[in-house]
Every structure is written in C-alpha cells, then in structure tokens.
C-alpha cells in the first residue's frame, strides 16, 4: 500500500515538475464540434470568406477527403448561415455522411437543407436521396446508436422518414411512392390497420395519378384482408375490405388485378359466412334462438354466390330446425292459452 502511494506521488511530481510540450490534435470549436488537426496543420483549410471555404469543402469532397469536406462545409453553415453558399455546404454535409454510409445522419442533414433552404437548387435531388435512404432502411439497414454503432432495424423509424418526405414535399415526384412505402412498413410490422390508413391517404391525396391511386386502393383492400384474417369474430374489417375492393373494381375496371380482386371478395364473403356461422352457433348453444336465426340468415345471404357451399347448407339446416322448434313452441303457447 505504501509502495503504491509512493509511486503515485512520484508520477504526480513528474507531471507537475517536468512539464513537456504535447501536440493537441483535437480542437473544439463552438458550432463545429471537435476537429482533428494534424501536428503542424495549423488549420490551413480555414478561409475567411464563405465562397473560398465552400471551394475547400467541394474540392475535398471531389477528392474523397470526406473528413476535410465535413469540416469545411460545417464551417460555412455555422459562420455564414445566410450566405448564398450555405445551401451547397449543407448539401455537401449530407453527401459526405451518405457516402460514408451514415444514412440517418445524411437524412437529417438533408432535412435541415430542405427546411432551412427550401429554395435550394438541389431540392428535388435531396428528396430523392432521402427516399433512397428510407428505402434502404425499409429493406433492413440498421439504425445506429451515437451515430457509430449499428444496433437494430426499425420500421417505426423508417415510417417516420417516409412521413418527413411526404410532409416536406407532398407533391414531389417521390411523395406518392413514399406514402405507399409508409403502408408497406406498417405491413412489415403486422400493423395492418395503420397500413390501410396509409394506403387510404395515398388513394385520396393522389387520386389524379391513376396508377398510384389504383395501387393504393388495391393495397388498402389487401391490408384489410390481412387484418380480417387475424380477427376471429370481428367481421367489420372483412366488410371494409370488400367495400374497398368493390370501389377498386368500379373505379379501375380495366386494371389487370380486377379478377384477383373478385376472387378475394369471394374469399372474404366466405370468411364472413364462417364468422357469422360461429356466432349463430354460439347463440344457439345458449338457447338464444332468435339471435341465432338472425346470424344463420346472414350466412345464407352472404352465400348467395355459392348457395350450395358447406356454410350455406349448414345454416339452412339449422334454420329449418329452429323454425320448426319455434312453430312448435308457438303452437303449444296457443293451445295453452285456450
């Protein structure tokens, strides 16, 4: 213990009594963050005019020196944020991060460009780049923690990226597809209700683009169909799916998917018939015959296209039995009244 204390005292004395020069390659600048400066570098990349500083950033980017490009571009947007050169510098920031594979940071820098410099010449290109980044995340790219550590894929965060694209450029060339992608990300989560809402919004907002609107309406119907398959006794979503597919066939009768939509409607009606049959049996087992009869009749109605189906035949048989029982009970009541 004493020996360790003596050693610590000697080290402390050496540091205090024998100072030495040490290069400081890490320099912190407010607004620019920590920067690495090689020994003797002296900040030779810094310029006193925005235009000259942007030239340094662009030249460095063209030479694939992304560290220098980031420093120089960051300096432009920090010191000269209102200059004519700031938008291009902000664009270079996004391009550097995207090239380095830091897609989330790139997306965020592009978002700053769109919000802070909406008249920038790269507006459409930036939206397209954001869309491509969001698609990469939808396809499984991992989000990073502290900008460095890839940790997990996230459909929630991916949907947020697409929503930002739609909000920023609602009528841009990539906005319709971005709105559809929101629905796809929700489907990947198994969140079919939100997926259907996203598709519905796409169909309503871009009704004047027939291909987009038709795709949105068809996918909305599929989302409701998927949701109906997970709801054992709730037939409302099946009815919604049928309504959407019916609208799809009415609005786009020449679409090649119409025959498939017709098949799906038939499947959904069978599903509705099955669900109503289960409910009818439930009430019949508890001797609620009037309620049971209502649901058996609904099964028959839903099976008009397939009157000889198993569900229809079963419902008809139960209706015959229930009606016979009710007639018998009514007759007994009448006889008792006499």
Report residues per predicted region.
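Acidic, polar-rich low-complexity tracts and alpha-helical solenoid repeat scaffolds
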Residues: 2, 20-338
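Bacterial N-terminal signal peptides
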Residues: 7-17
